[in-house]
Regions:
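Hydrophobic, ordered structural segments
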Residues: 1-59, 65-67, 81-82, 150, ...
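Electron-transfer interface patches adjacent to heme c in soluble/periplasmic c-type cytochromes
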Residues: 1-4, 91-132, 144-158
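The canonical Cys-X-X-Cys-His
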Residues: 9, 64-67, 71-81, 123, ...
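Residue-level signal for pocket-adjacent positions within structured domains
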Residues: 25, 103, 137
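Electrostatic cytochrome c docking/interface patches
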Residues: 39-69, 112, 183-205
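C-type cytochrome heme-c attachment and multiheme electron-transfer modules
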Residues: 41-62, 108, 115, 125-135, ...
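Extended intrinsically disordered, low-complexity coil regions enriched in Ser, Thr, Gly, Ala
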Residues: 81-87, 117-122, 132-140, 171-182
Length: 205
């Protein structure tokens, strides 16, 4: 995120009423309590550089890239991780196992496995309303994310949609056989977001 946006966030937090409460002690088990280990992990997996706009991309695409890779941090959930918890670059936006242990986070790249048959309007509409073009609704951990996305301007949601559609298409990071086994256990169908060509009647085509 930009320094200016971080300052704005701090200013907003400072404007909130103070709350007096007991804060539990900060405790982490081994090996996560080794601070030097966290520093090494940061060197391996955290890019501390500020966002640099692509001079060859449109203002809309650059705005979408900033929102998706910065405050939106979409790769944190929609990418697989290695044994150290670092994001596997080849799986960025291509989905991941859910951290709870069952189910998978969907592939949101414009591939056949992902949301290749969604339009930019479909994606923007999902962010605004929580409704997918496949007559489904956002649920579970994505629900509060969508509620926050609905607070964005229409232009920002459109920018996010444009950037998502510009991503390189990738196959599912979670094998479909594993997705099916997990869905069978949960008694539901996979909600990959690309299983149906049907469009929501209220989405502008």
């Amino acid at each position: 995120m930009s320094f200016e946006d971080l300052i704005d966030l701090k200013a907003y937090l400072d404007s909130l009423p103070a709350v007096k409460n007991e804060v539990p002690p900060y405790e982490l088990g081994f090996p996560f309590n080794i601070r030097r280990g966290l520093g090494l992990w940061h060197k391996l997996y955290v890019n501390g550089e500020s966002f640099v706009p692509d001079p060859h991309a449109s203002a809309e695409l650059n705005r979408g890239a900033y929102l998706v890779t910065g405050p939106g941090h979409c790769t944190e959930c929609h990418s697989s991780r290695n044994l150290l918890g670092g994001i596997v670059k080849d799986t960025e936006f291509a989905g991941a196992p859910k951290p709870e242990g069952k189910g998978s986070v969907p592939n949101i790249t414009p591939s056949d496995d992902g949301i290749g048959d969604w339009s930019e309007d479909d994606i923007a509409y999902l962010l605004e309303t929580g409704n997918t073009p496949d007559f489904d609704v956002i649920a579970e951990s994505m629900a509060p994310v969508q509620e926050n996305m609905a607070q964005l301007t229409a232009a920002d949601r459109k920018a996010i949609a444009a950037y998502i559609k510009s991503l390189p298409p990738r196959p599912d990071a979670v094998p479909k056989s594993k997705q099916k086994d997990e869905d069978d256990e949960e008694g539901g169908a996979a909600k990959s977001g690309s299983d149906s060509g049907a469009k929501h009647p209220d989405v502008p085509q």
